[in-house]
């Protein structure tokens, strides 16, 4: 994730102590509930950033020139258009 100074929950609170992890490595230990809440918020924000990337990768995968994928893509698009037309007419 980067250096410890870069993590927002370490910068935001003074309630950080260290604990020894596996291999004797020192890791920050969150003791204050606000730090934990902020860490959860950061994870949610990261998930929101990752989601558009996943969509882009999915679209790139769909655009590959594989005959099976092209067939599936056109079939799904046809069904979607038929479904949309049906919804609009009702």
Swiss-Prot record:
<keyword id="KW-0899">Viral immunoevasion</keyword>
<dbReference type="GO" id="GO:0052150">
    <property type="term" value="P:symbiont-mediated perturbation of host apoptosis"/>
</dbReference>
<keyword id="KW-0472">Membrane</keyword>
<comment type="similarity">
    <text>Belongs to the influenza viruses PB1-F2 family.</text>
</comment>
<comment type="function">
    <text>Plays an important role in promoting lung pathology in both primary viral infection and secondary bacterial infection. Promotes alteration of mitochondrial morphology, dissipation of mitochondrial membrane potential, and cell death. Alternatively, inhibits the production of interferon in the infected cell at the level of host mitochondrial antiviral signaling MAVS. Its level of expression differs greatly depending on which cell type is infected, in a manner that is independent of the levels of expression of other viral proteins. Monocytic cells are more affected than epithelial cells.</text>
</comment>
<comment type="subunit">
    <text>Oligomer. Interacts with human SLC25A6/ANT3 and VDAC1. Interacts with host MAVS.</text>
</comment>
<dbReference type="GO" id="GO:0039545">
    <property type="term" value="P:symbiont-mediated suppression of host cytoplasmic pattern recognition receptor signaling pathway via inhibition of MAVS activity"/>
</dbReference>
<keyword id="KW-1119">Modulation of host cell apoptosis by virus</keyword>
<keyword id="KW-1113">Inhibition of host RLR pathway by virus</keyword>
<feature type="region of interest" description="Disordered">
    <location>
        <begin position="1"/>
        <end position="30"/>
    </location>
</feature>
<feature type="compositionally biased region" description="Polar residues">
    <location>
        <begin position="14"/>
        <end position="28"/>
    </location>
</feature>
<keyword id="KW-1048">Host nucleus</keyword>
<keyword id="KW-1045">Host mitochondrion</keyword>
<dbReference type="GO" id="GO:0016020">
    <property type="term" value="C:membrane"/>
</dbReference>
<keyword id="KW-0053">Apoptosis</keyword>
<keyword id="KW-1046">Host mitochondrion inner membrane</keyword>
<keyword id="KW-1090">Inhibition of host innate immune response by virus</keyword>
<dbReference type="GO" id="GO:0044164">
    <property type="term" value="C:host cell cytosol"/>
</dbReference>
<dbReference type="InterPro" id="IPR021045">
    <property type="entry name" value="Flu_proapoptotic_PB1-F2"/>
</dbReference>
<keyword id="KW-1097">Inhibition of host MAVS by virus</keyword>
<dbReference type="GO" id="GO:0044192">
    <property type="term" value="C:host cell mitochondrial inner membrane"/>
</dbReference>
<protein>
    <recommendedName>
        <fullName>Protein PB1-F2</fullName>
    </recommendedName>
</protein>
<keyword id="KW-1043">Host membrane</keyword>
<keyword id="KW-1035">Host cytoplasm</keyword>
<dbReference type="GO" id="GO:0042025">
    <property type="term" value="C:host cell nucleus"/>
</dbReference>
<feature type="site" description="Low pathogenicity">
    <location>
        <position position="66"/>
    </location>
</feature>
<feature type="region of interest" description="Mitochondrial targeting sequence">
    <location>
        <begin position="65"/>
        <end position="87"/>
    </location>
</feature>
<dbReference type="Pfam" id="PF11986">
    <property type="entry name" value="PB1-F2"/>
</dbReference>
<keyword id="KW-0945">Host-virus interaction</keyword>
């Amino acid at each position: 994730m980067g250096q410890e100074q870069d993590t927002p929950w370490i910068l935001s609170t003074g309630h950080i102590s260290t604990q020894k992890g596996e291999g004797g490595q020192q890791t920050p230990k969150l003791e204050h509930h606000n730090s934990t809440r902020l860490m959860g918020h950061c994870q949610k924000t990261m998930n929101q950033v990752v989601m558009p990337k996943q969509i882009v990768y999915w679209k790139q995968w769909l655009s590959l020139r594989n005959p099976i994928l092209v067939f599936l893509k056109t079939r799904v698009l046809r069904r979607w258009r038929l479904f949309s037309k049906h919804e609009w007419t009702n």
